[in-house]
Amino acid sequence: MQKYTSEARQLLALAIPVILAQVAQTAMGFVDTVMAGGYSATDMAAVAIGTSIWLPAILFGHGLLLALTPVIAQLNGSGRRERIAHQVRQGFWLAGFVSVLVMIVLWNAGYIIRSMHNIDPALADKAVGYLRALLWGAPGYLFFQVARNQCEGLAKTKPGMVMGFLGLLVNIPVNYIFIYGHFGMPELGGIGCGVATAAVYWVMFIAMLSYIKHARSMRDIRNETGFGKPDSVVMKRLIQLGLPIALALFFEVTLFAVVALLVSPLGIVDVAGHQIALNFSSLMFVLPMSLAAAVTIRVGYRLGQGSTLDAQTAARTGLGVGICMAVVTAIFTVTLRKHIALLYNDNPEVVALAAQLMLLAAVYQISDSIQVIGSGILRGYKDTRSIFFITFTAYWVLGLPSGYILALTDLVVDRMGPAGFWMGFIIGLTSAAVLMMLRMRYLQRQPSAIILQRAAR
């Protein structure tokens, strides 16, 4: 029992800074929305539309680079720290290549925006302008993620938290300058949010790079003189590990976007109730997601040390802590669901629907916690391909079709409206949780030599 208690302490010590970093990131989005809304409703809508395109594109790159964390954790655990700098350098090359692709997609996103049904031309122009300003921050964001993944792979999660709050502090005044046109800068409205956010990502990257160069704990991990050329072998391995994670993230984000589109014709009350429940659930999701990042680090580190039993302990402890957290957040959601809904809106119909959907959200929080921590465990074992297949099957083959049938057809029961899609979420997330656990058990039952050989690749 003592080893599980000790492991839980180490996991929470890693996870809490990640949680706070995510809070800072969420707050940046909130600040952008509020400050753009203070300028005009059109500018706020433009930022919302632009963000809905930015997120899937940038999260694809973010997911691709997540492969660095278990790689670095495993090298750190095995005492091969001299190889870490080369892996990080190739991560920067990969981030550079992906940045170019993301920037091309975002530059041409106007075709997608202007093809939206009945969109106001002025709104479309502002959304395109916002994206074309923001896209210059894509390299800064992805380079920052490489540096952050280096720190987290070395079990240093606090720098990411500090840089997150630094970004938030810089974002507010820079937003003010570019939205309203102060200190000789042009008055850009919502487009100014894009300029500010792009600048903030570069500030965060430069600050993180400065930390890495001066941190005593990383003195033995220094990039070689010059930047070196791309190493096709290392980059291919990073892509093999990261691409399934990137695709899984992309399919998860697009699933919720598709559901939002399917709910939109049902009416204002249904859309508002669905959005409130989804927004609150996203806030609760920060807890298991951060714990999953910590579990990846611990499992990778233990496998690097050559101890498959300690890796199992880290995995089981992470699941136990995650389930306990989910039970607490589920009880909190059920107990205070009406009060939470009132924080968003005071329309009685909207509040009633949001409170009903939050009951379903409370049910799926446990499944959601298990599946996301399970994904973190599999990343630690470098078994990322299975994450993609499980996510795609659970969300798009089981969850979305069942949600569509329950919400919009009479095939099984009378049309349930938004609640049907939330039942689909429960089916999809529970399926993902079961499949993740089955895959984890299969991996852990393999001979230690095979597990360690996979981890060392």
Swiss-Prot record:
Biological-process GO terms, alphabetical: sodium ion transport; xenobiotic transmembrane transport
Topology of the protein relative to the lipid bilayer: Multi-pass membrane protein
UniProt keyword Cell membrane present: yes
Localization annotation: Cell inner membrane
Ranges annotated as spanning the membrane: 11-31, 53-73, 93-113, 127-147, 160-180, 188-208, 243-263, 276-296, 314-334, 350-370, 387-407, 418-438
InterPro entries linked: MATE_fam, MATE_MdtK, MdtK-like, Multidrug-R_MdtK
Keyword Transport included in the entry's annotation: yes
GO MF assignments: antiporter activity; xenobiotic transmembrane transporter activity
Origin superkingdom: Bacteria
Key words of the record: Antiport, Cell inner membrane, Cell membrane, Ion transport, Membrane, Sodium, Sodium transport, Transmembrane, Transmembrane helix, Transport
CDD domains xref list: MATE_NorM_like
One Gene Ontology cellular component: plasma membrane
Location (main, coarse): membrane
Function statement: Multidrug efflux pump that functions probably as a Na(+)/drug antiporter.
Family statement drawn from the similarity comment of this UniProt entry: Belongs to the multi antimicrobial extrusion (MATE) (TC 2.A.66.1) family. MdtK subfamily.
PANTHER family linked to this entry: FMN_FAD EXPORTER YEEO-RELATED, MULTIDRUG RESISTANCE PROTEIN NORM-RELATED
The protein, known as: Multidrug resistance protein MdtK
Organism encoding this protein: Salmonella paratyphi B (strain ATCC BAA-1250 / SPB7)
Lineage: Bacteria, Pseudomonadati, Pseudomonadota, Gammaproteobacteria, Enterobacterales
